[in-house]
Regions:
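P-loop NTPase catalytic phosphate-binding loop
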Residues: 34-240, 244, 257, 269, ...
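Phosphate-binding and hydrolysis-coupling loops of NTP-dependent motor/remodeling domains
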Residues: 1-51, 225-342, 349, 485-544
Length: 544
């Protein structure tokens, strides 16, 4: 019969059932067009293609989209190799094609098997966070809290209920933030598990009105706290080990998910089966990943606007070249401030004003630490502050030819008379003679005092009067020497009149300066210091 109907070109009788879902469906077929076309259109609804659904009871099959404005956050569960990472890839790529980086930003929390790494090149991606990135996770949590406070304040100021209304009234666009978490099961491995769960709970509860959305995947239902799961409206199940878990998640149904990658169940009016779309075309997983990387790279090349700021992380080792080229360091120099290092929170320059600068004392309780601070500061003054002339008291003859110095004093005979020469220079300047704007750099105070015979009385005069006549002292000392409180000693006088302090040691281990009690204060590495201040000190990363 089939051969006869085909030979006579007789059209087939309509079938009572639609064809079964294909195993490979591509999101680019379900939403036609390219990102250049989509980016030129504004005011698109926040919908993302997730797959193709089959509804036998209605004899219908159609593209399944998720509307984040209406349906909020998503939790997807599935066994190994069922397509959890693919789901997030599809969701992310479809949103990235439709919206510019000014409109949507992504935080990729890749707690699974590196399934989100191909998405990193997207210009929309603020950062990628792994489960062992403890510093990044801490800063992400703080950023989430800060962003929630900021967005709530904007809504209060304009007396509106959600971000969409705020944008209509103010004309100011703020990006929608998506936290894409693949592999929620691994969260228990993090020492910050409680803080993470609290942050996700806040997003799921309050994020919808603030334009902040959470998408999570997990291998088992039990790993997600009941309170968090209850606040997530859209739940999807891929094939799980036990079909009972699917019914627990989606609701009572006779449907069973086939054991095929990407085959899933979602509750619409009733539980329905759908096929998760693939993010790009490709004959196998490798080709799909290559296509994701290629398209993401094209988006990155095409986008010329601003991009989301990554979570700042202090590098393991900070070279001076990297430090000097840091934007905040360059900004500090233009504003006539002295950059001393990078803070550990925002990874930006911490600086002190050059106007009114008098003297700086740096202290460490280990010789290697003291020497590293010396080299760091010498590099700053000789390379970044050309208006100052550095005169180095090189008692140990360590720094020959290493820095662009105005003068290096290392000969014993010259050092022996240096205290008197400094006093004579001060007197001459007080009488009106002009001279260079000097940084008098003393890396080892104890040995300089021994070599020059510097007295406490001379220190008092130089420290109280010298800065008024462009004679500024940058002095390094071991803690054991500078803690000497003998009446009239140079160490005591320096402490009495010093302006700025850098400490290469735990605050709790010194008694020179006031300090908060902290029994758990960690020891510093040799490329870490405190810039002392009241009421709080700032921990800095310095070059090495």
């Amino acid at each position: 019969i089939q051969l006869l109907t085909e030979s006579q070109q007789i059209p087939p009788v309509p079938q009572p059932w639609l064809p079964p879902l294909k195993e490979r469906i591509y999101s680019t077929d379900l939403r036609k067009g390219n990102f250049k076309e989509f980016w030129s259109h504004t005011n698109r609804s926040l919908k993302a293609v997730i797959g193709y659904v089959d509804i036998p009871s209605q004899q219908a099959q159609y593209t399944l989209e998720h509307d984040f404005n209406e349906d909020g956050n998503i939790a997807l569960f599935g066994g190994p190799l069922t397509g959890k990472s693919t789901f997030i890839q599809t969701l992310t790529m479809d949103l990235a094609r439709q919206f510019t980086p000014n409109q949507v930003n992504f935080y990729l929390l890749d707690f699974g098997t590196n399934g989100l790494l191909p998405l990193r090149q997207l210009p929309h991606v603020a950062d990628t966070i792994m489960i062992d990135d403890q510093e990044k996770i801490t800063k992400l949590i703080n950023r989430i809290k800060g962003e929630i406070r900021y967005r709530k304040a904007l809504l209060r100021q304009h007396m509106v209920a959600n971000v969409n209304l705020y944008q209509e009234i103010s004309g100011h666009q703020i990006p929608k933030l998506f936290f894409m978490l693949d592999g929620y099961d691994a969260i228990k491995e993090s020492p910050l598990v409680m803080e993470l769960e609290d942050a996700f709970q806040i997003i799921s509860r309050e994020g919808l009105s603030l334009g902040m959305y959470l998408v999570i995947t997990a291998g088992r239902i039990g790993v997600v706290k009941a309170a968090l799961l209850a606040s997530i409206k859209t739940r999807i199940s891929l094939k799980l080990t036990d079909d009972i878990d699917t019914r627990t998640l989606i609701g009572r149904t006779q449907l069973i998910i086939e054991d095929k990658p990407g085959r899933a169940m979602i509750k619409l009016d009733e539980p329905e089966i759908f096929q998760v779309a693939l993010p790009t075309k490709g004959d196998d997983a490798f080709e799909v990943i290559e296509q994701i990387s290629s398209e993401a790279g094209m988006m990155s090349e095409q986008w010329e606007g601003s991009r989301p700021k990554p979570i700042p992380i202090v590098p393991e080792e900070l070279s001076f070249d990297t430090f000097a080229k840091t934007i905040s360091v360059q900004k500090a120099l233009k504003e006539n401030t002295l950059p001393l290092g990078l803070d550990f929170v925002n990874v930006e320059s911490v600086d002190i004003p050059m106007k009114g600068f008098k003297h700086l004392l740096y202290i460490a309780n280990e010789g290697e630490h003291l020497e590293n601070i010396t080299r760091h500061l010498l590099e700053i003054f000789t390379t970044l502050i050309p208006s100052k002339k550095v005169m180095l008291m090189d008692v140990d003859d360590e720094y020959d030819g290493q820095f662009n110095l105005f003068a290096r004093i290392s000969e014993t005979e010259t050092l022996e008379d240096m205290a008197n020469q400094l006093m004579l220079e001060l007197e001459d300047r007080k009488k009106g003679e002009t001279g260079h704007d000097f940084i008098i750099f003393i890396p080892n105070l104890e040995k300089f005092v021994q070599a020059s015979g510097l007295t406490g009385e001379q220190v008092s005069a130089l420290y109280q009067e010298g800065w008024k006549y462009n004679m500024h002292f940058v002095v390094g000392s071991s803690y054991s020497y500078i803690s000497n409180n003998a009446i009239g000693s140079p160490a005591r006088q320096i402490k009495a009149y010093n302006q700025h302090y850098l400490l290469g040691m735990r605050l709790t281990d010194q008694t020179i300066l006031e300090k908060p009690y902290n029994s758990k204060e960690p020891y510093l590495n040799k490329d870490e210091v405190y810039l002392y201040g009241r009421p709080s000190s700032v921990k800095l990363k310095i070059t090495i």
